[in-house]
């Protein structure tokens, strides 16, 4: 694939990884707050699990792009 396209994809992947990290941190804060306030955090915890899977997928995509850019095997 053309290097310019890969670089653009890498920028997008980096942004996605950063966004998912921020969402995970926010969700973790909500869990702590809910538990501290005596509220049920089950749904918040389930959502955190989904966010962690999404983050893992985004990191894998970033790694794939880096491999393609720099020829790592």
Give short role names for the model-derived ranges.
Residues 1-73:
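Anionic, Ser/Thr-rich low-complexity intrinsically disordered regions
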């Amino acid at each position: 694939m053309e290097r310019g396209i890969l670089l653009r994809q890498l920028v997008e992947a980096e942004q996605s990884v950063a966004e998912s990290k921020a969402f995970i941190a926010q969700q973790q804060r909500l869990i702590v707050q809910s538990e501290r306030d005596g509220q049920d955090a089950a749904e918040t915890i389930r959502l955190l699990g989904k966010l962690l899977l999404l983050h893992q997928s985004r990191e894998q995509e970033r790694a794939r792009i880096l491999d393609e850019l720099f020829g790592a095997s």
